[in-house]
From Swiss-Prot:
Topology in membrane: Peripheral membrane protein
Subcellular location per the Swiss-Prot or TrEMBL entry: Plastid, Chloroplast thylakoid membrane
One BP term from GO: electron transport coupled proton transport
An example Gene Ontology molecular-function term: 4 iron, 4 sulfur cluster binding
Transmembrane intervals: none
Family label: Belongs to the complex I 20 kDa subunit family.
Protein name per UniProt: NAD(P)H-quinone oxidoreductase subunit K, chloroplastic
Predominant location category: plastid
Protein origin, superkingdom: Eukaryota
Catalyzed reactions: a plastoquinone + NADH + (n+1) H(+)(in) = a plastoquinol + NAD(+) + n H(+)(out); a plastoquinone + NADPH + (n+1) H(+)(in) = a plastoquinol + NADP(+) + n H(+)(out)
Gene that produces this protein: ndhK
Keyword list, A-Z: 4Fe-4S, Chloroplast, Iron, Iron-sulfur, Membrane, Metal-binding, NAD, NADP, Plastid, Plastoquinone, Quinone, Thylakoid, Translocase, Transport
E.C. designation(s): 7.1.1.-
One GO cellular component term: chloroplast thylakoid membrane
Length: 227
């Protein structure tokens, strides 16, 4: 062992014995080797891209972005996920080797965001497709929040046991409520509902008799001349 990296090794730990388990050793080795697969579809990914620069320097956590899911053990979803993109995202997740983790970044990824109100093609939460380990809310989250999410994921990995990995597999997952669509009649028929129009119709000048309208108009004109 290199004594330069461990200067106190000869003085203190020369005859020491380190006892651990294979599970803890495996977790410790994976803490500094999280290789993320970047899945950015919207503006949240711009905030994550700033982490690559020298200001935040996310390389200190051992994060090495990979372009292939077969070389990654962390997928970071940032942005809106649509119905058409759902099969591709699920395929990328299935191609990642075990153990694998997911960070949902941004409101659009977690709940569908502002696009989930009237959109028929937006997935209302990426956890309906793949299991999520860390939720990172925000629109968009700051780079400091992304670092905090990675730190929390590292703490989760350090305490992980083999049974936890089994529970996260698709066959043992509890899915959330699926999308429920119903076909309704079209309201854009070009015809007005007369009953509804009469109910919410506000009074206008067209309902005032002509003689009354001109009477008040002449009175207002005379007062303006006096003033």
């Amino acid at each position: 062992m290199n004594s330069i990296e461990f200067p106190l090794l000869d003085q203190i730990a020369q005859n020491s014995v380190i006892s651990t388990t294979s599970n803890d050793l495996s977790n410790w080795s994976r803490l500094s080797s999280l290789w993320p697969l970047l899945y950015g579809t919207s503006c949240c990914f711009i905030e994550f891209a700033s982490l690559i620069g020298s200001r935040f320097d996310f390389d200190r956590y051992g994060l090495v972005p990979r372009a292939s899911p077969r070389q990654a053990d962390l997928i970071l979803t940032a942005g809106t996920v649509t119905m058409k993109m759902a099969p591709s995202l699920l395929r990328l997740y299935e191609q990642m080797p075990e153990p694998k983790y997911v960070i949902a970044m941004g409101a659009c990824t977690i709940t569908g965001g502002m696009f989930s109100t009237d959109s028929y093609s937006t997935v209302r939460g990426v956890d309906k497709l793949i299991p999520v380990d860390v939720y990172l809310p925000g629109c968009p989250p700051k780079p400091e929040a992304v670092i905090d999410a990675i730190t929390k994921l590292r703490k989760k990995i350090s305490r992980e046991i083999y049974e936890d990995r089994i529970k996260s597999q698709p066959k043992n997952r509890c899915f959330t409520i699926n999308h429920k669509f119903r076909v309704g009649r079209s309201i854009h028929t070009g015809n007005y509902d007369q009953a509804l129009l009469y109910k919410y119709k506000s009074p206008s000048t067209s309902e005032i008799p002509p003689e009354t309208f001109f009477k008040y108009k002449n009175a207002a004109s005379s007062r303006e001349l006096v003033n």
